[in-house]
């Protein structure tokens, strides 16, 4: 519901970019939500310019993380029950098919700052200050994890908790422009390259 057009002024989004459905010039309308989609019958603007990696897909808790099904999809079911399978995962989190089934301009909001980020910032900061997670840090990260359906305990040692926080940033903010900043802030250069290589093993040194 977070990204539904009708619910765009929700309390989760602290600050966001509000697009207009009435502007038709160039890229002024909110088309970011469908430019990520694969080609679908009846969706005129789907381009599939940026798809998710297999590494991202596999990193989710496939059984329990409720964010997976609303964020990424490997197939699409049409209203007549027919199914289209994809050869890779695509980002569906922004598309409100009820508000604009053909993928034209909508009144969607692109979130810049969300409440979930504030919880994770608290968790990250407390772990750095204390060189390990105290009770407040665990409560903060669990505010995000529990909402997503995750109830398993997170490690409280410094490195283990830091990895858990980075993982939550990754899953909570898919295609919201966070990943690069999270990796450069929380990882050493060696860790950064290792993570990128795992995500895109076909990439060249120049692309890094």
Where does each model-flagged region fall?
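Short, cationic low-complexity segments
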Residues: 35-51, 56-57
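Active-site-adjacent substrate-recognition loops and nearby beta-strands
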Residues: 25-35
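Acidic/polar-rich alpha-helix caps and helix-coil junctions
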Residues: 1-27, 62-208
């Amino acid at each position: 519901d977070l990204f539904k057009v009708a619910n765009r002024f929700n309390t989760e989004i602290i600050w966001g970019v509000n697009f207009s459905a009435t502007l038709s010039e160039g890229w002024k309308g909110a088309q970011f939500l469908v430019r990520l989609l694969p080609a679908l019958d009846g969706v005129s603007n789907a381009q599939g310019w940026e798809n998710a990696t297999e590494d991202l897909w596999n990193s989710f808790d496939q059984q329990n993380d409720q964010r997976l099904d609303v964020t990424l999809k490997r197939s699409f079911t049409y209203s007549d029950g027919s199914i289209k399978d994809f050869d890779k995962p695509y980002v569906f989190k922004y598309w409100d098919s009820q508000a604009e089934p053909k993928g034209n301009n909508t009144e969607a909001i692109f979130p810049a700052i969300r409440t979930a980020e504030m919880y994770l910032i608290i968790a990250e900061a407390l772990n750095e200050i204390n060189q390990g997670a105290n009770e407040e840090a665990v409560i903060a990260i669990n505010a995000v994890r529990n909402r997503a359906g995750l109830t398993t305990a997170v490690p409280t040692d410094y490195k283990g908790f830091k990895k858990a926080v980075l993982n939550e940033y990754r899953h909570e903010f898919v295609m919201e422009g966070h990943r690069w900043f999270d990796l450069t802030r929380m990882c050493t250069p060696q860790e950064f390259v290792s993570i990128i290589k795992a995500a895109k093993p076909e990439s060249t040194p120049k692309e890094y």
